[in-house]
C-alpha cells in the first residue's frame, strides 16, 4: 500500500507534465525571447501577479470549503453523514485531496482571469473628471468597477455552486445509505432529509446570496451611466427618477433581508427566509414595471424637455472621451478672391499638392521596383522630409521579401538564405515623369539616391511581411540582393536573436514541429534564431493590452529603416460616452519604434495626460520611455494617425452639436464626404489625405491630416476638419465651418461637375475607348486664405493584364471654374494669368467650338500605337505616343 502511495505523486507529476508539455516549451521560449528583447520584467509581471494572488485566494477557498464540509459532519445523529463522510479517516483524506486540488484550480482560474483588473485597481490614476450623476471620478468606472463586477460574479457563482453541490452530495449519500441498509428511497422525506443534512448551511448560503444581490444592485446603480434606454447614451430621466430609486430600495431591503435570514437561522426559524426571498423577487419585478410606466406615461410625451440635462451629459462626456473637446473652431467664409500674390505666398503648399495617388503608385512600385519576383511592397507610406534643403511630402515603401513566393520554397531558402528584404523606394508626391509615372528620388538595388537622406544599411529583417523565423550567422551566406551576374551575400551583424545551443535547437524543433533545427548541418554554435519578426505582432506580444494602428509606417534615419506604429489606449467603460466600434474612449498615447535590422522595440509615451497609459506604466514598470528619449529625427516623423482621426471624424459628425435641443432634433448631422474613383464607378467614403499646407492664419507650411464633411445624406460640403502634427503643433485639431447658405463642392460633387463639363467629358470619353480606362486619383481640396482650390489627378490605364496606370492630366477648379492641364503649375498659370487675375471662363467659350475630325482621327492613331507599344513592352514608344495624344487633346479648344 505504501509503495502505491509513493508512486502516486511522481505519476501525477508526469501526467501533468505530459498534459502541459507544449505550454511548458512555449513558456521557456517566451522567457528566452523576452530576455533577448529586454522586456523580461514585463513578461513576469503577469506571472508574478498570478502567483501572489493565488496564495491568499487558495487559502480562502481551501478553508471555506473545509469549514463547509466540517459543518456538514458536525451532527453525529445524521446517519447519512456518518456513513458518507465520517465513518473512517479515508473519507477525510480523500476529501482533503479533493479540496486541495479544487482550491488550487479555482485559485488559478480566478488569479489568471482577474490579475489584470486587480493590478489596474491597485494602480488607479485619476482622470480629474467626475460623472454628473454620482460624482465619482471616471477612474472609478474604468479601473475599479470592473473588479467589483468580477468579484460579484465569482462569489455568486461559488455560492450557487455550494447549493448545487450540497444537494448532489445529499442525494448520493442518501442513495448509498438506502442501498447499504436495503431500504426504499422515499421521495416524500427529501425535504426533511435536506433540512437534517444541511438545513442551516443552505440557509446561511441563501442569506449570503441575498446579501450579494444587494451588492449586485449597487453595481447596477453605478452601471446606469452606461444605460442605452434613453434617447442618448448614459442615464436617462427614467433611469435617474425611477430605476435608480428602485435599485436603492432593493439594496436596502436585500441588505435587511440577509440580516433577517441569518438571525432566523440562529433561532431555528426558516419561514422568514422564504419571506425575504419572496420580497426580493417582488421588488425586482416591480422595478421593471415602474420603469416601463414612467417611460411611457411621463417621459414619452415630454421627452425633449425632460431628457435635455441627460443629453447634455452625453454630449460633454462623449466629446471628452474622444478628445473632441479641445478642437479649435473657426468660420471659413469662402470669398474666392485670390490674387497672384496669394498664390506666390502659398507656393510651398501648391508645390506639395499630391498628384500621385496611393493605389496607382503602389501598383507601379510592385511592377517596376520589385527587381525580382520574390520582393514585394506591402503598402505605400506618406511622410515629410527635408530633401536637399526643401520641405517635401513624399511616398515611400520598404522592399520586403515575400517568402511565400520563393521558388523553390525549401527550408534553407525560407529560413537560412532569404532572411531579409533590401532597400526602400521614395518619390515626391507632387511630380511625375513625362510618362506620368512616379519620379523616384530613391530607387533600385543597391539604392540610387538623389537626396541628402542617408541609407547605408537598408536591410529589413523586421517588417510588415516578415512572418516567419530566420536563422542567421549560419554556414550558408544570406542572400543580400541580386546583381546582374551573381547575388550579393551578407552576414548578419545585428544583435537580435536567440543563441542556437543544443537545448535551444531542441526547444524550437518541438515548438515549431520542425526536425530541421536538429538535423541541419548549417547551424553553428554562434548562429541565432530570430523570431517574432512581424513588427505589429512583435509589439502585440510585448504589450497586448494596447490597440495598434492598422498602418505602420517606415522612417529612414541614421542610415537605416525604422518602423513607427501608433498605439492606442481604449476602453468601453467611460461614463455617458457613446460607443463607436465597441469603444467609447481612445487616446494615441504611445508610439512604438522598431529597428528593421536589430529589432529593438521601444514604446514612447506621447500623451502624458492619459490616465490609462499612466496606469499601464505603473503596472508594467520598464516598458515605457518618455517621448523626449526618442531621437529628434524620429520624433520629427511622428504622424497624427488615420485610424484615430477616422473614428474622431465619425463621432464629430454627430457630436459637433453642443446644444441638447438641436441634438435631440437631429437637425445638424454631418457625415464624411463621399468620393468616386472611377468615372462611372460607385461612391465610397473619402480617404482623409495628409496635406502639406499653410493654415489660413499661419505663415509656415506644415503637414495636416484633413477630412471633408457634408451635410448628412447631401453632397454639399459643410466643414473641414484638420489635425496638425509638426513640432509643437502636434495633436492640435481645428474645425473650419463653411457657409451653410452657399453650395460648396464636396469631393463627390466636384466629380459630378467634372463629368458634366462638356469639353472634359468628351476627352474622357475619347480616352475610355477601346478598353483603356480613365481613373480619378486622390481628390485634394486645398484651403488657401479664404478660398478653396480643387485638384483632381487623372490616370489612364491601358488595356492589358500588366498595364500600369499613368497620371496624364490634372483638373483644377477655382471659383466654380474648371481647367484641364498637364500639370498643376500649368493649370495655375492658366487660372491666374487671365485678365484682372480672375479665371478666364474658358468652358463657356469652348462649348460653342467644334472639334476637328482630323484631329480626332490623329488622336485615335496615336492611341492605337501607344496600345501596341504597351503590349510589346516598349515603354519608350508608349510614352512618346501618349504624349502626342495629350498634345492633340490640348489643342482641341
From Swiss-Prot:
Transmembrane spans: 9-29, 49-69, 94-114, 154-174, 202-222, 246-266, 273-293
Membrane topology of this protein: Multi-pass membrane protein
InterPro entries: UPF0182
Pfam families hit by this protein: UPF0182
Sorted UniProt keywords: Cell membrane, Membrane, Transmembrane, Transmembrane helix
Intracellular or extracellular location(s): Cell membrane
A GO-annotated cellular component: plasma membrane
Keyword Acyltransferase annotated: no
Keyword Cell membrane included in the entry's annotation: yes
Similarity remark: Belongs to the UPF0182 family.
Listed HAMAP family: UPF0182
PANTHER family the UniProt entry points to: UPF0182 PROTEIN SLL1060
Name of the protein this chain belongs to: UPF0182 protein CLI_0022
Amino acid at each position: 500500500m505504501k509503495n502505491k502511495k509513493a508512486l502516486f505523486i511522481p505519476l501525477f507529476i508526469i501526467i501533468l507534465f505530459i498534459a502541459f508539455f507544449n505550454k511548458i516549451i512555449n513558456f521557456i521560449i517566451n522567457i528566452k525571447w523576452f530576455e533577448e528583447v529586454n522586456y523580461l520584467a514585463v513578461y513576469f509581471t503577469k506571472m508574478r501577479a498570478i502567483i501572489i494572488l493565488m496564495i491568499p485566494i487558495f487559502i480562502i477557498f481551501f478553508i471555506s470549503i473545509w469549514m463547509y464540509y466540517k459543518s456538514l459532519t458536525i451532527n453525529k445523529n445524521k446517519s447519512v453523514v456518518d456513513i458518507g463522510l465520517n465513518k473512517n479517516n479515508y473519507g477525510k483524506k480523500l476529501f482533503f485531496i479533493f479540496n486541495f486540488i479544487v482550491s488550487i484550480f479555482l485559485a488559478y482560474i480566478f488569479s489568471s482571469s482577474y490579475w489584470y483588473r486587480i493590478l489596474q485597481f491597485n494602480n488607479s490614476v485619476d482622470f480629474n473628471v467626475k460623472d454628473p450623476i454620482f460624482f465619482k471620478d471616471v477612474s472609478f468606472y474604468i479601473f475599479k468597477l470592473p473588479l467589483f463586477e468580477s468579484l460579484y460574479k465569482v462569489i455568486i457563482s461559488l455560492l450557487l455552486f455550494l447549493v448545487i453541490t450540497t444537494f448532489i452530495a445529499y442525494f448520493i449519500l442518501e442513495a448509498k445509505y438506502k442501498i447499504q441498509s436495503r431500504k426504499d428511497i422515499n421521495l416524500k422525506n427529501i425535504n426533511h432529509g435536506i433540512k437534517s443534512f444541511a438545513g442551516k448551511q443552505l440557509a446561511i448560503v441563501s442569506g449570503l446570496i441575498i446579501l450579494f444581490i444587494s451588492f449586485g444592485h449597487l453595481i447596477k446603480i453605478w452601471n446606469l451611466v452606461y444605460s442605452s434606454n434613453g434617447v442618448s447614451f448614459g442615464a436617462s430621466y427614467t433611469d435617474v427618477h425611477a430605476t435608480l430609486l428602485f435599485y436603492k430600495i432593493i439594496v436596502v431591503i436585500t441588505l435587511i433581508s440577509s440580516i433577517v435570514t441569518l438571525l432566523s437561522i440562529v433561532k431555528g426559524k426558516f419561514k422568514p427566509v422564504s419571506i425575504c426571498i419572496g420580497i426580493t423577487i417582488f421588488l425586482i419585478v416591480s422595478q421593471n414595471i415602474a420603469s416601463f410606466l414612467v417611460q411611457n406615461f411621463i417621459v414619452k410625451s415630454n421627452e425633449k424637455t425632460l431628457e435635455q440635462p441627460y443629453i447634455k451629459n452625453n454630449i460633454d462626456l462623449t466629446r471628452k472621451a474622444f478628445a473632441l473637446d479641445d478642437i479649435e473652431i473657426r468660420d471659413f467664409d469662402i470669398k474666392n478672391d485670390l490674387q497672384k500674390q496669394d498664390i506666390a505666398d502659398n507656393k510651398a503648399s501648391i508645390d506639395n499638392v499630391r498628384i500621385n495617388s496611393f493605389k496607382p503608385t503602389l501598383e507601379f512600385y510592385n511592377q517596376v521596383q520589385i527587381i525580382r519576383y520574390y520582393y514585394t511592397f506591402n503598402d505605400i507610406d506618406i511622410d515629410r522630409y527635408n530633401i536637399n534643403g526643401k520641405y517635401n511630402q513624399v511616398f515611400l515603401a520598404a522592399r520586403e521579401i515575400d517568402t511565400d513566393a520563393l521558388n523553390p520554397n525549401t527550408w534553407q531558402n525560407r529560413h537560412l538564405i532569404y532572411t531579409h528584404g533590401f532597400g526602400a523606394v521614395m518619390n515626391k508626391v507632387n511630380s511625375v515623369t513625362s510618362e506620368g509615372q512616379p519620379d523616384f528620388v530613391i530607387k533600385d538595388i543597391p539604392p540610387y539616391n538623389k537626396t541628402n537622406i542617408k541609407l547605408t544599411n537598408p536591410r529589413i529583417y523586421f517588417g510588415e511581411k516578415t512572418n516567419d523565423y530566420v536563422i542567421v550567422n549560419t554556414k550558408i551566406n544570406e542572400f543580400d540582393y541580386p546583381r546582374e551576374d551573381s547575388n550579393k551575400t551578407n552576414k548578419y551583424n545585428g544583435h537580435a536573436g536567440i543563441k542556437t545551443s543544443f537545448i535551444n535547437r531542441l526547444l524550437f524543433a518541438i515548438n515549431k514541429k520542425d526536425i530541421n533545427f536538429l538535423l541541419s548541418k548549417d547551424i553553428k554554435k554562434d548562429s541565432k534564431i530570430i523570431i517574432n519578426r512581424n513588427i505589429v505582432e512583435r509589439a502585440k506580444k510585448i504589450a497586448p493590452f494596447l490597440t495598434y494602428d492598422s498602418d505602420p509606417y517606415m522612417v529612414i534615419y541614421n542610415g537605416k529603416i525604422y518602423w513607427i506604429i501608433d498605439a492606442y489606449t481604449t476602453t468601453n467603460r467611460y461614463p455617458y460616452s457613446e460607443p463607436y466600434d465597441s469603444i467609447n474612449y481612445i487616446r494615441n498615447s504611445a508610439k512604438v519604434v522598431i529597428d528593421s535590422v536589430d529589432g529593438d522595440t521601444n514604446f514612447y509615451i506621447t500623451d502624458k495626460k492619459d490616465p490609462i497609459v499612466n496606469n499601464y506604466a505603473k503596472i508594467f514598470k520598464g516598458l515605457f520611455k518618455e517621448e523626449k528619449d526618442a531621437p529628434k529625427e524620429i520624433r520629427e516623423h511622428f504622424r497624427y494617425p488615420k485610424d484615430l482621426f477616422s473614428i474622431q471624424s465619425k463621432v464629430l459628425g454627430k457630436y459637433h452639436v453642443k446644444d441638447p435641443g438641436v441634438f435631440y432634433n437631429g437637425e445638424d448631422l454631418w457625415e464624411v464626404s463621399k468620393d468616386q474613383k472611377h468615372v462611372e464607378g460607385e461612391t465610397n467614403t473619402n480617404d482623409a489625405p495628409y496635406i502639406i499646407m499653410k493654415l489660413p492664419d499661419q505663415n509656415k507650411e506644415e503637414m495636416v491630416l484633413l477630412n471633408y464633411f457634408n451635410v448628412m445624406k447631401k453632397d454639399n460640403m459643410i466643414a473641414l476638419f484638420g489635425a496638425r502634427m509638426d513640432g509643437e503643433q502636434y495633436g492640435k485639431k481645428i474645425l473650419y465651418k463653411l457657409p451653410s447658405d452657399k453650395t460648396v463642392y464636396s469631393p463627390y460633387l466636384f466629380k459630378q461637375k467634372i463629368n458634366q463639363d462638356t469639353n472634359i467629358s468628351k476627352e474622357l470619353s475619347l480616352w475610355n475607348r477601346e478598353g483603356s480606362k480613365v481613373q480619378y486619383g486622390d481628390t485634394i481640396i486645398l484651403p488657401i486664405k479664404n478660398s478653396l482650390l480643387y485638384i483632381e489627378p487623372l490616370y489612364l490605364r491601358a488595356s492589358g493584364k500588366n498595364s500600369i496606370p499613368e497620371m496624364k492630366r490634372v483638373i483644377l477648379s477655382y471659383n466654380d471654374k474648371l481647367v484641364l492641364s498637364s500639370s498643376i503649375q500649368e493649370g495655375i498659370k492658366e487660372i491666374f494669368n487671365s485678365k484682372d487675375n480672375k479665371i478666364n471662363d474658358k468652358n463657356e467659350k469652348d462649348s460653342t467650338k467644334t472639334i476637328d475630325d482630323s484631329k480626332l482621327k490623329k488622336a485615335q492613331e496615336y492611341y492605337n500605337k501607344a496600345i501596341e507599344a504597351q503590349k510589346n513592352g516598349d515603354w519608350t514608344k508608349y510614352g512618346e505616343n501618349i504624349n502626342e495624344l495629350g498634345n492633340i487633346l490640348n489643342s482641341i479648344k
